[in-house]
Amino acid sequence: MDYQDYHEPVLARESVSLLVTLPGIYIDGTLGGGGHSLQLLRHLQTLNGDSLLVGIDQDTHALEAAGKKLGEFGDRRRLVRGNFGMVKELVEPMMRGAGNGLPVMGFLLDLGVSSFQIDTPERGFSYLKDGPLDMRMDPDGPLTAADIVNGYEEAALAKLFFRYGEEPLGGRIARAIVSARSSAPLTTTGELAEVIRAACPRKDLAIKTLSRIYQALRIEVNDELGVLEQALEDGFELLSSGGRFAVISYHSLEDRIVKRFFAAKTSADWGPKGLALREPLKPAEAVLVVRKPLEATAEEISRNPRSRSARLRVIQKL
């Protein structure tokens, strides 16, 4: 396993330049191969004062690759296994230990699935390469895509595809899966892809349907949206005053969650209309660093196509 197997980090220059302001603890909650962390550490070297980079990933392969990539930085980085929804319990001990009382000044989340995971058939993330129906970001996780495809009832599958895939053919696909598995369990990504393609009334739309169904399964397997909501709450709580929170999202479901959370933190609560209060019931807790989400440039998209749908939002805690 080598860090070169991992994708070029998306919006790296923009996210790092907007995130890093003052020395302190910086958290890369989606370490992957260490691309963003490398840029963060290089930027932190230009600041006067002690800093510590904490990298979090639930994939042991990613931790191994990032460890090689960031080896030159020694004890200025700490890499820990876990998902970013556990950020509070993972980072708080470091604030008292290796962090030596440093404040948390930045938290970065890149919510995309790594190209290494997608391109590794054994991980079961892609319909383009046949492999076991797995999709676990944590290889030791309890739930696989095969468990869902072969175990959920038709109504539950349809609901899942509508909710997490926003797939209009969700009910039709669910029926096709239940029919197919009645003969034998679906165990590979290729078998599932064949069932989905056959169920699509228009073959020119099959790729979009495949993408949405696989997205829905991946989100369910890894509880991605629940983990994100937990990480937003706990990550913001960890930040010191002046600390910044940057999130790169790739699809509307996760971006809506981030947008709603950031809007709540940057808005004051003035209570019901008509109260005419002199001061808000609850003041804003943060300010927007960028008013509109940043997107990749045409140059970056041509160089790194997976950046096409990326959106970067950043707030600063008051």
Swiss-Prot record:
UniProt-annotated binding residues for S-adenosyl-L-methionine: 34-36, 57, 84, 110, 117
Main localisation: cytoplasm
EC number(s) on file: 2.1.1.199
Enzyme class: transferase
InterPro entries named among the record's database cross-references: RsmH, SAM-dep_MeTrfase_MraW_recog, SAM-dependent_MTases_sf
Pfam families linked: Methyltransf_5
Function: Specifically methylates the N4 position of cytidine in position 1402 (C1402) of 16S rRNA.
PANTHER family: 12S RRNA N4-METHYLCYTIDINE METHYLTRANSFERASE, S-ADENOSYL-METHYLTRANSFERASE MRAW
Family, per entry: Belongs to the methyltransferase superfamily. RsmH family.
Protein name (Swiss-Prot/TrEMBL): Ribosomal RNA small subunit methyltransferase H
Lineage of origin: Bacteria, Pseudomonadati, Chlorobiota, Chlorobiia, Chlorobiales
